[in-house]
């Protein structure tokens, strides 16, 4: 009804790829109306060449698990170097997750998922990855006596013969170990989505190439993947949107230019 209403001049949508695709089909009959889609993401966070392990773990944790992972720009995939340093980072992250409290309400970091359906879908996603060959580091489970509260999932997808490139809207982080930085970038781009990405590193020069090579709309350095500003364009490519970034650029496609040629008689 909203898409077809004659007084509606356009529709700006935030939601999943599935919902965006359905709306796009309806709006195809109304090319005169604006359609801006901000959809999901399978967002990569690459950690490379850093000795500041505690700081890196803080950023990883915040990127993946803020709001119980229920933000479109949350990190979904963590790409680490296949080195002792990478394994140390993963071990610290595991400890950080295990230290979360689920009983003391004054010390809760995050709350439940939005609905029973979302909770079941989240756990089914985890089971799907395990079925495809992923290895569990920390397996998510429902917290007893709670309403849709689940523990975070940490899962190793390195070596999976078949990838599962879908957005998982919950507190899950998929870990991939890469042998080289080029391999890390290639894995970061190994997705149909392109919303957010991040690099954590002591080497600022790495970001110069990273930001050019990564296929995403929001690309942060030594910051959480969820950090964004309304003063900048906000949006993604691929299945993450239809090339209509929100934020600062929205003013351009929500208006139209008027061209005039003016002469004296």
Predicted regions and their residues:
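A structured beta-alpha segment of the ubiquitous adenosine-cofactor-binding alpha/beta core
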Residues: 1-12
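Phosphate-coordinating loops and pocket residues in cytosolic domains that bind phosphorylated ligands
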Residues: 4, 58, 115, 186, ...
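Solvent-exposed alpha-helices and their adjacent loops that cap or buttress functional pockets
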Residues: 3-5, 27-29, 36-39, 70-72, ...
């Amino acid at each position: 009804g909203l898409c077809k209403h004659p007084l509606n001049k356009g529709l700006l949508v935030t939601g999943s790829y599935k919902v965006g695709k359905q709306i796009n089909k309806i709006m195809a009959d109304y090319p005169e109306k604006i359609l801006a889609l901000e959809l999901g993401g399978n967002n990569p966070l690459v950690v490379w060449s850093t000795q500041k392990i505690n700081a890196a773990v803080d950023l990883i944790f915040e990127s993946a698990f803020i709001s119980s992972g229920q933000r479109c720009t949350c990190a979904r995939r963590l790409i680490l170097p296949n080195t002792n340093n990478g394994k140390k980072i993963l071990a610290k992250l595991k400890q950080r997750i295990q230290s979360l409290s689920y009983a003391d309400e004054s010390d809760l970091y995050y709350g439940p998922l939005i609905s029973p359906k979302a909770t079941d879908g989240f756990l089914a996603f985890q089971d799907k990855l395990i079925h495809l060959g992923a290895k569990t580091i920390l397996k998510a489970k429902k917290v007893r006596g709670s309403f849709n509260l689940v523990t975070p999932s940490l899962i190793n997808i390195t070596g999976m013969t078949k990838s599962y490139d879908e957005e998982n809207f919950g507190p899950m982080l998929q870990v991939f170990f890469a042998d080289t930085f080029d391999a890390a970038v290639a894995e970061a781009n190994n997705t149909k989505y392109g919303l957010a990405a991040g690099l954590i590193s002591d080497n600022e020069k790495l970001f110069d190439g990273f930001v050019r090579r990564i296929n995403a709309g929001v690309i942060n350095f030594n910051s959480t993947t969820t950090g964004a500003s309304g003063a900048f364009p906000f949006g993604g490519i691929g299945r993450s949107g239809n090339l209509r970034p929100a934020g600062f650029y929205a003013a351009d496609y929500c208006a139209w230019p008027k061209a005039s040629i003016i002469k004296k008689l």
